[in-house]
UniProtKB/Swiss-Prot annotation:
It is found in: Cell membrane. Induction: Induced by auxin in an ABP1-dependent manner. Triggered by brassinosteroids, including brassinolide (BL). Accumulates in reduced red/far-red light ration (R:FR) conditions mimicking shaded conditions. Repressed by abscisic acid. Induced by light. This is Protein SMALL AUXIN UP-REGULATED RNA 9. The gene is SAUR9. Keywords: Cell membrane, Developmental protein, Growth regulation, Membrane. One of its GO terms (cellular component) is plasma membrane. Provide a mechanistic link between auxin and plasma membrane H(+)-ATPases (PM H(+)-ATPases, e.g. AHA1 and AHA2), and triggers PM H(+)-ATPases activity by promoting phosphorylation of their C-terminal autoinhibitory domain as a result of PP2C-D subfamily of type 2C phosphatases inhibition, thus leading to the acidification of the apoplast and the facilitation of solutes and water uptake to drive cell expansion. Triggers plant growth probably by promoting cell elongation. Regulates branch angles and bending. Probably involved in light intensity mediated root development. It comes from Arabidopsis thaliana (Mouse-ear cress). Its main location: membrane.
């Protein structure tokens, strides 16, 4: 029985990540004429972090990291994913840089 529950949790998490990817990729399509999205390589997406909204282009593989998923959940709760300002992560930039240094 525990196996079924963990499989359901994994499927639910995979579905959530798929939705996030869809939203991120649709941001790029909506703003193709915008120079901000021309420099985003395939397999990456831009996020905006901190008080000054510093822009980071991050690999999609980071969506597998629990810590990054937690940041995305905070972003969804605070801003939602469907706003004009891009995917904004409500996190201090120093904390974000420290976190992503662990992913590399």
């Amino acid at each position: 029985m525990a196996i079924k529950k963990s499989n359901k949790a994994a499927l639910s998490q995979a579905a959530s990540l798929k939705q996030i990817l869809k939203r991120c990729s649709s941001l790029g399509k909506k703003n193709q004429g915008n120079c901000y999205f021309n420099d985003v390589p395939k397999g990456h997406f831009p996020v905006y972090v901190g008080q000054h909204r510093s822009r980071y282009v991050v690999p999609i593989s980071w969506l597998d990291h629990h810590e990054f998923q937690s940041l995305l959940q905070l972003a969804e709760e605070e801003f939602g994913f469907e706003h004009e300002m891009g995917l904004t992560i409500p996190c201090d930039e120093v904390v974000f840089r420290s976190l992503i240094s662990m992913f590399r």
